[in-house]
């Protein structure tokens, strides 16, 4: 039983790691500018219009880039809501908006054909969008003057080959998100089954089964199934209501839950919860609360559907030391999602998973129950490691991107090391499992080994130029001339802008790498400065269907773009080198 559960936990951990982009080189999928920052303008009165941005999760707008310029009108000073302070490695302390921004505009004077020119620009981790300029009339009608036209041209593009790394169509992206959400939701069901095999719950299942059935003669199998199912549904109702309440409360605070202080606090809280799973201390309801709930439960009579249902509801409130930490973590996850459907369904599946063993024991008796022992404590400890994945995921959202693989690597090494220590050395199968775990440990240590290797070669790398020597091009016509003149060599075109954080990361961490520079020496390396978002820049973006920056294009020896090799978003040096080697 322990081995099966360990394999389940390893699967969960690998899924979390893959979702967080642990060691993979897959290109991330980015939304279009119109999807990431859905803009609308709504007239509120003859003298006021309301600008609204619905900002996708994980994306943000820079406050300093939001500018409103009146045409044939005068407006009162802009009244921004409180912004989030954000530390950027390259731009220092900046103010940003996440999730939603509403900006009321009040006119103090206006003439005929009055309008507003609204300028804004935003980013997400590893990717930035060109500045947007929208013209808004007083009746709320709007016309996009700049970069959003690129997204529209993308949809109408007649390019001969699809872009492998371009974002998917909106309906495809939605379908993929729904599929991913369904998968993540069902992990709560597996988590519930796992919680039933903790040392605080498993030994109580036979007693609980007897209480559910009651003191009368054992009912037939069908009635026993219905009674146990009623108990589980009562417990599930309590958990579902908890999920709905927490999700509803979480909705107004989604902006706060994105700020670094809150994310750091949540990471510390999850670490404390994980420590409780390691047995350092216990988290439970106050004794007085538990005694009152237990007294209420004892007043109910077993064997009756209504009483059994109420008993299940009360049991859902009595959080044991083994289940309170994972339950708290699940509730915090639900609060951050702010989704009522997700919140209710996730906690329902958690309770349903916890109730499956109870139903089986009620039907088939204690003979199917695994024997208690030290393995129960190991299951609890394994849950502690799963809990530690949450702080890593939270901190990866605010730390520089090169720290994320190091954190996942450290967690994986500690987890695998613990698995090696608890698996006995006797037996051929167990020895084979240990060998596989040792190999897994070696793979998990790769980011740290790569870090040490790069530091060890830093003195030698210093002899190489710190900055890659790009040849600048200004327009599409000039680029085509360069491609014609570069016959016989591959060409790399880097689209760069001063406002692009990930472009600066490429410049600092990737293009300064010795191995990358040696590989690029085999090519012609060109660069376009997109900082001013000029008409020439816009022409390039439309021609190549570029969504945002950084974007790096590659051309073969004949000057034809290698569309399958386009890079969107930041890649570290080793990832980018692997990408170059596949050209």
Curated annotation (Swiss-Prot):
Keywords: Cell inner membrane, Cell membrane, Cytochrome c-type biogenesis, Disulfide bond, Electron transport, Membrane, NAD, Oxidoreductase, Redox-active center, Signal, Transmembrane, Transmembrane helix, Transport. The keyword 4Fe-4S does not apply. It catalyses: [protein]-dithiol + NAD(+) = [protein]-disulfide + NADH + H(+); [protein]-dithiol + NADP(+) = [protein]-disulfide + NADPH + H(+). Residues 440-583 form the Thioredoxin domain. Disulfide bonds join 123-128, 200-322, 500-503. HAMAP family: DbsD. This is Thiol:disulfide interchange protein DsbD. The gene is dsbD.
């Amino acid at each position: 039983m322990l081995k099966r559960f360990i394999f389940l936990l390893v699967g969960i951990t690998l899924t979390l790691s893959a979702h967080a982009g642990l060691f993979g080189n897959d290109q991330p999928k980015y939304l279009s500018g119109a999807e990431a920052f859905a803009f609308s303008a709504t007239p509120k009165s003859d003298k006021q219009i309301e600008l609204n941005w619905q900002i996708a999760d994980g994306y943000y707008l820079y406050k300093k880039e939001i500018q409103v310029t009146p045409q044939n009108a005068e407006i009162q000073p802009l009244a921004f809501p409180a912004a989030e302070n954000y530390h950027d490695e390259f731009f220092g302390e900046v103010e940003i908006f996440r999730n939603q921004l509403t900006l009321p505009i009040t006119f103090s004077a206006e003439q005929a054909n009055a309008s507003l020119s609204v300028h804004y620009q935003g980013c997400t981790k590893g990717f930035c969008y060109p500045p947007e300029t929208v013209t808004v009339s007083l009746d709320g009608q709007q016309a996009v003057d700049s970069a959003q036209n690129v997204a529209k041209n993308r949809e109408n593009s007649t390019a001969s080959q699809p872009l492998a790394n371009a974002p998917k169509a909106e309906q495809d992206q939605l379908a993929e998100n729904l599929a991913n959400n369904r998968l993540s939701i069902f992990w709560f069901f597996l988590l519930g089954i796992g919680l039933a095999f903790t040392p605080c719950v498993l030994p109580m299942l036979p007693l609980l089964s007897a209480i559910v059935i009651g003191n009368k003669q054992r009912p037939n199998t069908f009635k026993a199934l219905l009674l146990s199912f009623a108990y589980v549904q009562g417990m599930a109702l309590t958990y579902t209501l908890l999920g709905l309440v927490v999700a509803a409360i979480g909705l107004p605070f989604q902006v706060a839950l994105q700020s670094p202080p809150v994310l750091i606090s949540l990471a510390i809280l999850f670490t404390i919860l994980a420590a409780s799973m390691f047995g350092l201390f216990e988290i439970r309801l106050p004794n007085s609360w538990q005694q009152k709930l237990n007294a209420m439960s004892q007043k109910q009579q077993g064997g009756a559907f209504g009483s059994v249902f109420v008993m299940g509801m009360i049991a859902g409130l009595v959080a044991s030391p083994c289940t309170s930490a994972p339950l708290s973590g699940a509730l915090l996850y639900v609060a951050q999602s702010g989704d009522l459907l997700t919140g209710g369904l996730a906690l329902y599946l958690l309770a349903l998973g916890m109730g499956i063993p109870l139903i089986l024991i009620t039907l088939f008796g204690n003979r199917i129950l695994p024997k208690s022992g030290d393995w129960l404590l190991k299951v609890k400890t394994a849950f502690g490691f799963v809990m530690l994945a949450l702080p890593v995921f939270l901190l990866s959202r605010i730390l520089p991107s090169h720290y994320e693989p190091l954190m996942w690597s450290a967690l994986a090494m500690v987890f695998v090391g613990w698995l090696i220590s608890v698996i006995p050395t006797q037996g051929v199968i167990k020895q084979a499992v240990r060998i596989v775990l040792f190999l897994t440990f070696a793979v998990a240590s790769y980011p740290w080994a790569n870090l040490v290797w790069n530091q060890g070669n830093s003195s030698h790398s210093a002899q190489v130029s710190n900055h890659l020597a790009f040849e600048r091009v200004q327009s599409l016509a000039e680029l085509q001339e360069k491609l014609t003149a570069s016959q016989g060599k591959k060409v790399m075109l880097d689209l760069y802008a001063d406002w692009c954080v990930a472009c600066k990361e490429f410049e600092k961490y990737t293009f300064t790498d010795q191995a990358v520079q040696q590989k690029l020496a085999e090519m012609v390396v060109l660069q376009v400065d997109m900082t001013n978002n000029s008409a020439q820049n816009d022409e390039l973006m439309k021609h190549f269907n570029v969504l945002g920056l950084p974007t790096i294009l590659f051309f073969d020896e004949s000057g034809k773009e290698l569309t399958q090799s386009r890079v969107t978003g930041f890649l570290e040096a080793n990832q980018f080198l692997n990408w170059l080697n596949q050209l």
